[in-house]
C-alpha cells in the first residue's frame, strides 16, 4: 500500500525544523534525508533562506489557536507554496504532487510542509498542532496520538510537569 507523503511525516519534520532551525544547507538536506525525504535536486543557500522564511509564516499557523484565523493563515501558505494537485508516476507508481516537477529544493519542501499541515489539521483536527504545555518549554509538536490529547512535546516534559504539579501539592 502506498502512503500519502503529504501526511504526518511532513508536519512532524516541519515542526522539528521550526524547533531547531538548520544553520546550513547541508544540515537542512541531512535532516530532510533522515526524515525520509527523497533528495533528487541540489540545494543552496537560497533554499535555506526560503525555508527559514516559510518557517516564520508556519509559526503563525502554530501560534494561532482560533480555528478560523488558523485556517486563513494556512490557506495563505498553501496559496503561496503549493500548486494545483496533479497526478504523476515519476517513481513507478501513481501519486499526487502539489507542485511542479522542476521546482527548487525549498519549493519542494514548502509545498510538502504546507499541504502536509493542511492534511494533518483536516484529518486529525484543527487543534492538533501546538506548543508544549510544560513550564519554560516552547517546542512545537504535531499531535498524532489516537485520542488527540497530547499536550507535551516529549515524555520528558510530561514527566517534569507531573513532578512540578506533585511538588506544588506537597
Language-model features and meaning:
Residues 1-143:
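Short helix-coil boundary/hinge micro-motifs
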Residues 143, 159, 163:
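Short, non-ligating residues that shape and space the ligands of small metal-coordination modules
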Residues 148-158:
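Cysteine-rich micro-motifs
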Residues 165-170:
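Contiguous alpha-helical segments
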Amino acid at each position: 500500500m502506498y502512503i500519502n507523503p503529504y501526511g504526518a511525516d511532513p508536519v512532524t519534520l516541519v515542526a522539528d525544523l521550526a524547533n531547531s532551525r538548520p544553520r546550513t544547507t547541508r544540515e537542512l538536506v541531512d535532516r530532510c534525508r533522515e526524515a525520509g525525504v527523497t533528495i533528487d535536486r541540489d540545494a543552496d543557500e537560497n533554499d535555506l533562506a526560503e525555508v527559514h522564511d516559510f518557517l516564520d509564516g508556519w509559526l503563525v499557523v502554530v501560534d494561532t489557536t482560533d480555528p478560523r484565523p488558523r485556517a486563513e493563515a494556512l490557506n495563505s501558505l498553501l496559496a503561496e507554496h503549493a500548486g494545483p494537485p496533479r497526478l504523476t508516476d515519476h517513481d513507478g507508481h501513481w501519486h499526487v504532487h502539489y507542485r511542479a516537477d522542476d521546482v527548487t529544493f525549498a519549493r519542494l519542501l514548502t509545498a510538502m510542509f504546507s499541504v502536509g499541515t493542511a492534511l494533518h489539521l483536516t484529518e486529525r483536527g484543527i487543534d492538533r498542532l501546538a506548543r508544549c504545555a510544560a513550564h519554560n518549554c516552547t517546542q512545537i509538536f504535531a499531535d498524532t496520538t489516537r485520542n488527540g490529547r497530547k499536550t507535551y512535546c516529549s515524555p520528558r516534559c510530561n514527566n517534569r510537569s507531573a513532578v512540578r504539579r506533585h511538588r506544588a501539592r506537597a
